[in-house]
Amino acid sequence: LVAAAVALHLYTDWRKPIFLNKVEAEQNEIKRSIRLFKRRTDSLLGFLRTKKPIIIDINNGEQFSLEYQEIMTDLLDITDDLFTLLDNYKIILNENVHNHHIKFINKNSESLEKIFDVIGKFDPVIYYSLSFNLVYAELQKEEYSLLLREVIVNFPDGLTTFYKHISQ
């Protein structure tokens, strides 16, 4: 019986560092992806603030549309990667033990999904004009700045807080 208790203790001590390493690795990937998301979002917002399309630039293939399409395509790719990372991260968490953190992840995934619903509604290359008009109008709203703040600022802070909590 004592041997079983010692074995269980050693097994538990051995598993915790592996779990912490997995969490840390996944969180680092998520944070890296969030930084890329922030850069591309800043690029998009800066682009929308500083550049105004001339009537001829509304046509697909003009310099303005090409810049917009490049920014949007990168932003959509990064957002898709971030969704994948979040799904993979939730797999390593135990629903019974980390339920609060999983709810936090889901809340941020929902914020990201609301952003994606706007930026991904129309293909920025094929339906450039529709995409531009929708994104320009929607990102002016206060709701989207709050969603972006949630994903870009509060989400990484919550990940760090969770890691500090489980590593103690």
Give the ranges of each region predicted by the language model.
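Amphipathic, soluble alpha-helical interaction motifs
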Residues: A4, P17, R40-S43, F47, ...
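Short, solvent-exposed segments of well-ordered alpha helices
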Residues: P17, N21-N28, L66-Q69, T73-L76, ...
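A solvent-exposed, charged loop/short amphipathic helix patch at secondary-structure junctions
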Residues: K52-Q69
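Membrane-embedded hydrophobic alpha-helical segments
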Residues: L1-P17
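An amphipathic alpha-helical interaction surface
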Residues: E70-Q168
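Alpha-helix boundary/capping and short turn/kink residues
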Residues: A4, L20-V23, H98
